[in-house]
Amino acid sequence: PLPLMSAPQHIYIGTDSGATTSKINAVWDNEEPVSKKVFQRPTNSQNGTEAVINGWIESVNIFLKDHNLTWAQVDGVGLAIPGPYQRYGVLDRSANLPLSFAGWDVHEDYSRALAKAAGRPVPLVMGNDGQFGGVAEARYARKDTKHSVLMLMPGSGLGCAYIDQNGLPIPGDTLASMEGAHMPAPLQMLGNIKP
């Protein structure tokens, strides 16, 4: 008799989109990382929303190929992207993204692109990049304790997250978590900067 072949392990893809760089990685269904190296590419937000979506899909395809994985193994995708949001899945005006991105239903567009690439619907969950990063890092920082965690993540802005004692974030009214930067500033009061 032929030896029993084990079924391929399933994965969950993470897409972390910043204003300038997007990152891709994945975890196995046992929550272990597929790779300890994050795959990074330019976001290309200056080229519009379609270019961003196409870049994410191309990046996922490269990641899958580089790790001998297939779309059939992808059980879900998470998208971390800066806020604020008009509502779940729809971006609002963000200081570090083009004005044309306000009102973009990124959840709908990415869901459609994922389904086309996979040949079937792929569950997609999205949220604020600071919030998602905070939940992940708090899990490691807290270990088995019941402490709250405040996380500050500098990038093109300052992503922030407060994670409560139960490991849950505070999303806020605009689902932007505790976005700590990209706030209006009186430039004339910051030294030699003219408004």
Locations of the language-model features?
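Short beta-strand segments
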Residues: 16, 78-82, 127, 150-157, ...
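Glycine-rich phosphate-binding loop and adjoining helix at the ATP-binding site
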Residues: 45-54, 73-76, 83-150, 188
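Short, flexible coil/linker elements and helix-boundary hinge sites characteristic
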Residues: 65-68, 119, 167
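N-terminal phosphate-binding loop and adjacent alpha-helix
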Residues: 33-72
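Conserved Rossmann-like nucleotide-cofactor binding loop
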Residues: 20
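Short, Lys/Arg-enriched N-terminal segments with co-localized hydrophobic residues
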Residues: 1-4
